[in-house]
Amino acid sequence: KHTAKDFHNQSVNPPVVRASTIIFKSMQDIRKTQGKAQKNPTGGHYDYGRQGTSTTYILQKILTKLEESYHVFTTPTGFGAVFLAIFSITRPGDEIIVADPVYSPTRLLTEKFLKEFDIKTIFYNPRDLKTLEKNISKRTKLIFVENPGSNTFDFQDLGKILSIAKKNKILTAIDNTWGTPYFLKPIKLGFDMSIVSATKYYSGHSDVMGGSLAVSKRVFQKVYNAERITGLRLGPDDAYLITRGLRTLDVRLDRHRENAKKVASFLSKNKKFKLLYPFKKNSENFRMWKKYYSGASGLMGLKIKSKNVNSVRKFVNSLNLFGYGYSWGGFESLALHQEFRETG
């Protein structure tokens, strides 16, 4: 809330600076700016709009402090941050190891798209990290974690994964959209890259799309080069809206946590449902969540114990306060039957 205040413009909110061209007074000035950018690539020195403006720079400063990272790159979508992370590290002939229950577009990217570029993906069981270590080879360049896993809500032993990666000198990335750095700070924990879909809790109002990729110092240059090549940069209008949303992130997530706990308590008492959420204290999921997170967000899974698919539709269609649609983390309550979610 108190990061990157704009005393120059004397406005409590940063102005939206839209620019394709950055104007300079002289050739010396543009060369001077380019020299500053080379010496300090995180300092907000731009010579062209594709690199960003002061509006996107302010958001990056706020997120860098929130993540406690070396730097944060912002992308047009959350999945753009996933792509940038993987594209920055992998090359033809490499291998990556990915958590099995990942977000379906991430699986599509790693399982099918990367295969066309001779990049092999091996999926590991989050409940059996021996399968992770067993599949490491000399070609393994990245371990990609999603915590908790989409659909299954498996919480993994992050410390153990980092230990395996460190022992084998492999880079690590985690999709931390569920927890956000408000509840978990992956870079501080030891991850090289931390991904958050800013479309969700960062924005909080279901009116903008964006992504963030926080990085450690040792992978910064690789990601920096990849970002400049791909042009994966968030626009100033979206950056402004996400910055505005971040002002209330703590208040909103605290309320999400309280409401989710009430819903989880209610659902856990019904034998017709299997709750996928870190609620039962005697479960492995709860222990892994408690070990690394300071809180829980509002997204949960629910299995209806019935072989009749119509019972699922009947349940979802009978909800009065929940809309039916994709995404989450906004102001509205949503429900979705995951069977129909193939691509994002």
Predicted regions and their residues:
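Short glycine-biased active-site loop of nucleotidyltransferases that positions the nucleotide triphosphate
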Residues: 10, 186-187, 291-292
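Conserved PLP-enzyme active-site core in the AAT-like
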Residues: 4, 71-270
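A short acidic, often aromatic-flanked loop/helix-cap motif at beta-alpha or helix-coil junctions
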Residues: 24, 128-133, 283-284
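C-terminal substrate-binding/catalytic lobe of Rossmann-fold NAD(P)-dependent oxidoreductases
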Residues: 17-23, 28
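Conserved N-terminal alpha-helix of the aminotransferase class I/II PLP-enzyme fold
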Residues: 26-80, 111-112
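Short conserved active-site loop signatures built around small residues
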Residues: 1-17
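Active-site C-terminal subdomain of aminotransferase-like
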Residues: 26, 30, 37-44, 51-52, ...
